Amino acid sequence: MEELKRQLDQMSEHNRKHYNYELSKLSEAEKQRLEALVVRMVKSGAKKPFEWAWSEFREGIPQWARFMVLKGMYQSAYDIPGNIDGSDEFDQETSNTYQEIVDKLGKEKLHQFLTSYAKSMLYNMIGIFDEGNFDYESNDSWLLMTQDRESGELGKPISGLHEDFLEFDQEIELS
């Protein structure tokens, strides 16, 4: 229960008392399960691993999966060099155009714009993932779900991504 203690020690006194009370009601097996979730969130780079793990533990929401989807999207938005390289697949002039814009605006200003633009596009995509199909003449829709890698068995839906996306940069360490 080392990581649980470490996370509780970082909380305000009020929150620490609340969660210590909640933890006192758990069995040893439940505490170990929560500890494993917290450790998993720490290893994933969450700034608030206890909150994410507690939500998964208490509400049954696949928060680790939600966190990893959002983290991957955010990392993609910040990967300007990788996105410029990848965009060459769609327009071979992209690298030249990028350099022309850098020469006029500067790299920092352009990267700030491109990151915001990428986040906006990703947020729109999240709406598609979260809401499914708006074509009401079709019975087909979709759902983002967890899946067991070994068995292929489908797990729980990964939904509500839009709820955390806008402020997600406060949830992770970006390198």
PLM features: residue spans?
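Mature extracytoplasmic domains of secretory-pathway proteins
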Residues: Y98-K119
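Conserved, folded interaction/cargo-binding domains in eukaryotic regulatory proteins
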Residues: F113-E131
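Generic hydrophobic segment detector
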Residues: W52-E56, Q75-E89, Q112-S116, G160-S175
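N-terminal low-complexity, intrinsically disordered segments
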Residues: E2-L105
